[in-house]
């Protein structure tokens, strides 16, 4: 289930999972329902910091949803992904015959953080 570059098991510092989804407009409510089932499982995982789902403002957007999930470490994310309940939840989303969602997940590390009033060199 893990794609190349999609795992961060060796990373002991905070990571962010960003997953961009293309979902047909008529399937968006069903997609969000499935995603919430998965998010409930992630929320109880050790090392989970938080997540949010963003929806494109424009109906014309190719990437209709963006999920941003923060983890204490890549290792914590990797461990959470091994949970059989989580894997089953993902399979339900992927194998749902009424959903034609395409996901583009990747794990990232912050390299620059900016807050109000910060001056960057």
Can you describe what each PLM-predicted range is?
Residues 1-15, 52-63, 89-121:
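Glycine-rich beta-strand-turn "strand-cap" elements at beta-sheet edges
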Residues 25, 49-52, 78, 101:
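Short alpha-helical segments used as structural interaction elements across diverse proteins
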Residues 15-22, 53-83, 121:
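Short, well-ordered beta-strand segments in beta-rich or mixed alpha/beta enzyme
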Residues 29, 75-77, 113:
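Residue-level signal for secondary-structure boundary sites
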Residues 27-50, 85, 89-93:
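Short amphipathic alpha-helical segments
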Residues 6, 25, 29, 80:
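Charge-dense, low-complexity intrinsically disordered segments
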Residues 10-16, 26-32, 66-70, 116:
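A broad, low-specificity signal for short, low-complexity segments enriched in glycine/proline
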